[in-house]
Amino acid sequence: MVPDDGEELYITLDWEGPLEAWVERNVVPYLDTVPESLVAARMSRADAARALAHYLAGDDDPLIIADWPEDVALFNALLVIGPGIMAEVPEISFRVVQLPGFSTAANSKVPHNALHDARALRDHILSLE
């Protein structure tokens, strides 16, 4: 999570299942390629949801911007912490933007790292305003 200003949030999940070869090659090696202050132990999905809820609690009107619909779906799936149970988050707005000619990965300092990709997306969107 990268706000316009303020503290960033970077979470990595504990995963013991099989990984697609592309993820193994292009994502996993770079999971901890973030500022040292943001490197943390892998979290369970439930702990990650609670950390995300705590982070969002500090925002009166959170707006999540994505350039791919699946990003919104995965974000929302993370909030589900059990059957019929979701993390306690404030009301959240989502905006999916189409950015012809812009590639998050191509503009990211560390392609396919969620933090760096989010920074690239944020910086590009702010440059359009």
Feature annotation, model-predicted:
Residues 1-2, 117:
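Gly/Thr-rich phosphate-binding beta-strand-loop-beta motif of the actin/hexokinase/Hsp70
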Residues 2-66, 70:
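Conserved non-catalytic scaffold segment of RNase H-like nuclease domains
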Residues 6, 80, 126:
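Residue-level marker of positions within ordered structural domains that often coincide
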Residues 71-90:
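Substrate-recognition/cap helix-loop segment adjacent to the acidic, metal-dependent catalytic center
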